[in-house]
């Protein structure tokens, strides 16, 4: 349906903003020609800023690949006004905020958010990046190592590898061809060999390119626009303006030599992918007409008659996406990516024939006004009823948009097609021709068939030319399937009215309970959007009873999603999302989006559960997909492996992936057919319904589900016995004990090692929670600074809190290519020893400042229904049911004394603490494997070496579960 537009005037120019947006906007231009968009939001708890600089990796000097990205790293270090190293990040982190940046081809974007009461100083520190940064020689060398570590992390990532291969196969004199991340070789070894000083080049690059007139700033504050403007004018007007012209890189990256090519590449992971791309007219020049969005909508559609539906029916594909890929003002690629099955890999030519058949269909049918109008209506509703998101996420895109779009479209960008122009769309359709395509085909089956290697990632590949006539042969060989345009979308909402809910509950209430289910209900009292959130957790004791059951339950949920895909895809396009996935004790159904037609989708999904049957052809495809996923576990980043082992050690009723992979090899369709009725035979459904839904509607939804599943003359489900209600249990580590688990990295080609150093502390308790959280806040930046910035152990360095079903702890996570896990573990202990004095000597003022920052973080309001619902659902699912958690913990924080934090640290965290319980997971990459034996010999006493994870877990006491503890009786 058409939605009333809402405009606001910005610097004398009208800007399109969402109808539901009550923020105020103002555009100003400083005397140095810096363009700034000010946003005032009195309701915000966090303030944020984003600076977009119109220079990126395309401007890297020859022989200094990655310099723009390296500069992005360096600006975080220090400035003349704030010379203490890393003080910017420290200040932001200690005041509840976060910092980040990215380098793109023609843009570098810096951004942060922080608690509102600390915004002034944070913004001033940020401004100094662009006024007088310090780039010391010592810091320069250390940060080159950080960039190198970041690159090491990417070397075995298929996404990074294929992207660089696509760039490699382009014109060498076009910047698209470049390697943009940088590494030790490009930023130190090669320049040094040529007598080039990287630091001098870094400063030169900064001075040449960082000019106020090609920067765009967005500042999001709580104060009035006038006050924010005053801040910005004081802080940012000293940025130098050297009147630079935004760099442009005309010309196409691909010549005839790089088109009509078939590239076969060998990926790291199992699976086959087919990517086809065409150089096309950049949509940015016609964003109101949205040619690539229109074509992506149709070629990427998954409903009946679509290309994907045909490929899925043939058993050849498991996924397909289409749309505009990399683009600038001068070039663009339209890309189609297809995930192939093993059978699909053997029918690549027919698949490409079907793709070109579908493109021919689009050429023959012409551009349809009703499809464009439908797409426009969906986009318009999405824009005007968009959820509020965290300020930093919101403004990053706006800052980038300011470079490209006229002022009126800064907020909307190209997300709102409004002008139907068949000629412009037809032009791009015609560009998707057999004469200018590029095919990238990835499979491990090409092992031994390649003769080339991409230089930066060493990806093995081969290349051959494919003529238009060959494509025509493939088109003729394609199977005869009925491809057609999608049907009109029945899920587009037409009722966007808000319910006048009688209940004004501020927390979920238990609305209904029966032997079959329990319904928690929370009406929308905050967001005023026509949306709802539904969560239904099917607790099935059989689901987690063995590795076999876990795999069978997984296959069941995937088959459900598979069967519903062509129907539910329309709902997804219209802004109504659903998913069926594994949960701790069974499987869960999630629905989120416009409430108008949500119940139709919910009842369809439940009907499919009730009438579930196994289709052998779809089972075979799903089994193949899941098998490859398990086989690819061994290619995960080492720190992900370490976190997995930590969970496997701690969480009861979890099974090793190797055992689940073994189950898959023997699984047949009839096993699933026999299992699902048994899985569902004993079930309890925990329900949460929130948003623009009245309480009687919520009750009616759940009653309908009970009628379908439990109250049939031959019910599919029966209620659980009281003894069957499942609980999540977590291993209780021994006080004063250290536990160690040493393991080879599962990918022999990966040089990176990883450590997770976990300290288990307590069972959910408000007063203990706040002490652990305060320790985490105070120690987080110190950890990052010491282990990453100073010691350069690795790009991935983090201190994070951990919550396993209400059992709280803290974990240090480090991945490194330069040091082994034993050494890293010793550095974590050293860090904790050094932290003692910092904590003991902390001034009362600093203590109060940290407490205030944590209080502000806790009082931060939920931005949208999804965020709020996830918070409450965690309480329901874990059984803690502390819906007042934030307020209670704030109350406890206000009473907290500094000595209590010190006592907590001394008792549970510090090295040698009497009640400390630590678990070190050490994963050894290929270059540190030889250190494992000596590391094992050197573990201190008293300690436990875990050899058999499941054997260890079964022999340990478990923490009590919150589920069933203090909950309302059924």
Curated annotation (Swiss-Prot):
One of its GO terms (cellular component) is cytosol. It is found in: Peroxisome. One of its GO terms (biological process) is proteolysis. Its main location: other. Signal peptide: none annotated. InterPro entries: Metalloenz_LuxS/M16, Pept_M16_N, Pept_M16_Zn_BS, Peptidase_M16, Peptidase_M16_C, Peptidase_M16_M, PqqF-like_C_4. Peptidase that might be involved in pathogen or wound response. Not required for peroxisome biogenesis, indole-3-butyric acid (IBA) metabolism, fatty acid beta-oxidation or degradation of glyoxylate cycle enzymes during seedling development. This is Insulin-degrading enzyme-like 1, peroxisomal. It comes from Arabidopsis thaliana. The gene is PXM16.
């Amino acid at each position: 349906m058409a939605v009333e537009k809402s405009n606001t005037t910005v610097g004398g120019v009208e800007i399109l903003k969402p109808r539901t947006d009550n923020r105020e906007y103002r555009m100003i231009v400083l005397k140095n020609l810096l363009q700034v968009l000010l946003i005032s939001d009195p309701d915000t708890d966090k303030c944020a800023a984003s600076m977009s600089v119109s220079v990126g990796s395309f401007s890297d000097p020859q022989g200094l690949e990655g310099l723009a990205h390296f500069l992005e790293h360096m600006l975080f270090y220090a400035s003349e006004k704030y010379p203490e190293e890393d003080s910017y990040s420290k200040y932001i982190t200690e005041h509840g905020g976060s910092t980040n940046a990215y380098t793109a081809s023609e843009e570098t974007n810096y951004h942060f958010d922080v608690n509102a009461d600390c915004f002034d100083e944070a913004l001033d520190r940020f401004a100094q990046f662009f006024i007088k940064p310090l780039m010391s020689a010592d810091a320069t060398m250390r940060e080159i190592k950080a960039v190198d570590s970041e690159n090491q992390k990417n070397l075995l990532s298929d996404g990074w590898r294929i992207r660089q291969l696509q760039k490699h196969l382009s014109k060498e004199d076009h910047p698209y061809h470049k390697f943009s991340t940088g590494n030790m070789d490009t930023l130190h070894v090669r320049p040094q060999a040529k007598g080039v000083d990287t630091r001098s080049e870094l400063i030169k690059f900064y001075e040449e390119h960082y000019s106020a007139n090609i920067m765009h700033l967005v500042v999001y504050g709580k104060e009035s626009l006038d006050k924010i403007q005053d801040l910005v004018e004081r802080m940012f007007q000293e940025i130098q303006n050297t009147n630079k012209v935004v760099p442009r890189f005309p010309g196409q990256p691909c010549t005839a030599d790089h088109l009509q090519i078939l590239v076969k590449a060998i990926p790291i992971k199992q699976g086959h992918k087919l990517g086809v791309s065409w150089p096309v007219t950049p949509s940015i020049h016609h964003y109101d007409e949205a040619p690539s969005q229109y074509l992506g909508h149709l070629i990427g559609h998954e409903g009946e008659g679509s290309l994907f539906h045909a490929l899925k029916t043939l058993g050849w594909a498991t996924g397909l996406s289409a749309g505009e890929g990399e683009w600038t003002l001068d070039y663009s690629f339209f890309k189609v990516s297809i995930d192939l099955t093993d059978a699909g890999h053997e029918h690549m030519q027919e698949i490409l024939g079907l793709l070109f058949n579908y493109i021919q269909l689009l050429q023959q049918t012409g551009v349809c006004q009703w499809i464009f109008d439908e797409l426009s209506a969906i986009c318009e509703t999405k824009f005007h009823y968009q959820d509020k998101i965290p300020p930093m996420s919101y403004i990053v895109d706006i800052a980038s948009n300011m470079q490209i779009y006229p002022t009126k479209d800064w907020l909307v960008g190209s997300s709102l097609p409004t002008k139907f122009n068949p000629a412009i769309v037809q032009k791009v359709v015609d560009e998707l021709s057999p004469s200018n395509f590029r095919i990238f085909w990835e499979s491990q089956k090409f092992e031994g068939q390649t003769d080339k290697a991409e230089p930066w990632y060493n990806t093995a590949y081969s290349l051959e030319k494919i003529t238009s006539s060959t494509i025509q042969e493939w088109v003729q060989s394609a199977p005869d399937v009925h491809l057609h345009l999608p049907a009109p979308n029945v899920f587009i909402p037409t009722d966007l009215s808000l319910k006048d809910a009688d209940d004004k509950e501020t927390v979920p209430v238990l609305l209904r309970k029966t032997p079959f289910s329990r319904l928690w209900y929370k009406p929308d009292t905050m967001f005023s959007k026509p949306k709802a959130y539904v969560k239904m957790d099917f607790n099935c004791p059989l689901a987690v009873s063995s590795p076999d059951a876990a795999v069978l339950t997984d296959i069941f949920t995937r088959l459900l999603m598979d069967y519903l895909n062509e129907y539910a895809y329309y709902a997804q396009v219209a802004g109504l999302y659903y998913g069926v996935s594994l949960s701790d004790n069974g499987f869960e159904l999630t629905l989120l989006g416009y409430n108008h037609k949500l119940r139709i989708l919910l009842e369809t999904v439940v009907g499919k559960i009730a009438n579930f049957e196994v289709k052998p052809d779809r089972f075979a495809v799903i089994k193949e997909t899941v098998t490859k996923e398990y086989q690819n576990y061994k290619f995960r980043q080492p720190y992900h492996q370490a976190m997995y082992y930590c969970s496997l050690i701690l969480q009861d009723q979890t099974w090793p992936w190797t055992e689940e992979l073994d189950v898959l090899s023997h699984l047949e369709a009839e096993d699933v057919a026999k299992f699902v009725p048994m899985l569902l035979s004993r079930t309890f459904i925990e329900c949460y319904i929130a948003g623009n839904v009245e309480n009687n509607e919520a009750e009616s939804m759940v009653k309908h589900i009970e009628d379908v599943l439990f109250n049939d003359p031959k019910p599919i489900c029966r209620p659980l016995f009281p003894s069957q209600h499942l609980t999540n249990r977590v291993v209780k580590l021994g006080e004063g004990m250290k536990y160690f688990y040493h393991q080879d990295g599962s990918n022999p080609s990966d040089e990176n090692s990883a450590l997770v150093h976990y300290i288990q502390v307590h069972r959910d308790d408000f007063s203990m929670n706040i002490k652990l959280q305060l320790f985490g806040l105070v120690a987080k930046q110190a950890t990052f600074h010491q282990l990453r910035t100073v010691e350069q152990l690795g790009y991935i360095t983090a201190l994070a809190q951990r919550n396993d079903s209400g059992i709280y702890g803290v974990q240090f996570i480090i991945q490194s290519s330069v040091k082994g896990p034993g050494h890293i573990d010793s550095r974590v202990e050293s860090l904790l020893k050094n932290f003692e004095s910092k904590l003991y000597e902390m001034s009362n003022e600093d203590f109060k400042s940290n407490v205030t920052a944590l209080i502000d973080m806790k009082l931060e309001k939920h931005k949208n229904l999804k965020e709020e619902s996830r918070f409450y659902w965690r309480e329901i699912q874990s059984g803690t049911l502390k819906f007042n958690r934030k307020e209670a913990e704030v109350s406890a924080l206000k009473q907290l004394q500094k000595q209590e934090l010190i006592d907590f640290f001394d008792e549970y965290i510090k090295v040698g603490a009497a009640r400390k319980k630590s678990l070190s997971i050490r994963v050894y990459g290929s270059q540190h494997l030889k250190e494992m034996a000596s590391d094992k010999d050197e573990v201190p006493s008293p300690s436990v070496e875990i050899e058999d994870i499941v054997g260890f877990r079964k022999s340990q006491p478990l923490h009590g579960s919150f589920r069933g503890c203090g909950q309302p009786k059924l």
